[in-house]
């Protein structure tokens, strides 16, 4: 599974799942451009990618910022072959208390950004008759979660968006898929109390949290030639927490 000669764009690549994805694609030969919301985050990405890529600052809710980043990538590396939409935020609240900005921020960052970025790379992929668009969803997008109506709506929306786009571009050799993680070991989960952690693990038949590398491996498979006949799918990586 080699990505030699491929250019990959991974949003939200400064840490966690995004960083694991970027490092996995680099290890398999791709040139990777990772994005962050701050200059310091972009520098950190450049530092860990080294000669194999670059970190850039990107506001995924701003069309001008997206176009600027893509122009930078074209000038230095060429057109994007693999787009990984990983950037996302949470603004949790019960619906009765949820403010409009808590709803709108999540939809703009977690859903509308995927529309903008996918559209921005589409023309070049269609010309090459090859491309991979992989979006990081969530188990919450399928099963729902109290206090996350905004987040669940955005993550569910990604699935419908990806299925529709997959139908539009399949004849051009472009695949569009979603990877939906369950509970993944992160800085946030490591800070949980023993009781909180036990409550989470009780929902997972595998009896453990997932690792960021396990999500990255799923992304790498869907980005590969081996997955060229898989499109419009959601790959659930959740230890059996939710079985579709």
Curated annotation (Swiss-Prot):
InterPro entries: 3oxo_ACP_reduc, NAD(P)-bd_dom_sf, Sc_DH/Rdtase_CS, SDR, SDR_fam. Substrate binds at residue 138. SUPFAM superfamilies: NAD(P)-binding Rossmann-fold domains (SSF51735). Pathway: Lipid metabolism; fatty acid biosynthesis. Ca(2+) 3 binds at residues 233-234. It holds the Pfam family adh_short_C2. Changing residue 224 to F: Distorts the local conformation and prevent stacking around Phe-221. The S224F mutation would additionally disrupt the hydrogen bond formed between Ser-224 and Glu-226. CDD domains: BKR_SDR_c (cd05333). Ca(2+) 2 binds at residue 145. The keyword Metal-binding applies. Ca(2+) 1 binds at residues 50, 53. Transmembrane segments: none annotated. Belongs to the short-chain dehydrogenases/reductases (SDR) family. This is 3-oxoacyl-[acyl-carrier-protein] reductase FabG. It comes from Salmonella typhimurium (strain LT2 / SGSC1412 / ATCC 700720).
């Amino acid at each position: 599974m080699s990505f030699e000669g491929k250019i990959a764009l991974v949003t939200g690549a400064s840490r966690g799942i995004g960083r694991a994805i970027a490092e996995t694609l680099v290890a398999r030969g791709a040139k990777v451009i990772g994005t962050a919301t701050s200059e310091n985050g972009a520098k950190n990405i450049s530092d860990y990618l080294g000669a194999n890529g670059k970190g850039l600052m990107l506001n995924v809710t701003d069309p001008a910022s997206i176009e600027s980043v893509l122009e930078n990538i074209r000038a230095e590396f060429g057109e994007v072959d693999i787009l990984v939409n990983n950037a996302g935020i949470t603004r949790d609240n019960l619906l009765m208390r949820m403010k409009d900005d808590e709803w709108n921020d999540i939809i703009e960052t977690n859903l509308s950004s995927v529309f903008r970025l996918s559209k921005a790379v589409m023309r070049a992929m269609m010309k090459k008759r090859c491309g991979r668009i992989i979006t990081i969803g969530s188990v919450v997008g399928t099963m729902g979660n109290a206090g996350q109506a905004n987040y669940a709506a955005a993550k569910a929306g990604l699935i419908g968006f990806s299925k529709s786009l997959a139908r539009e571009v399949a004849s051009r050799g472009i695949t569009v898929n979603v990877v939906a993680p369950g509970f993944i070991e992160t800085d946030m989960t490591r800070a949980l109390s023993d009781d909180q952690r036990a409550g989470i693990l009780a929902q997972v038949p595998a009896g453990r949290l997932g690792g960021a590398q396990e999500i990255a491996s799923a992304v790498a498979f869907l980005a590969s030639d081996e997955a060229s006949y898989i499109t419009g799918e959601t790959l659930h990586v959740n230890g059996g927490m939710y079985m579709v």
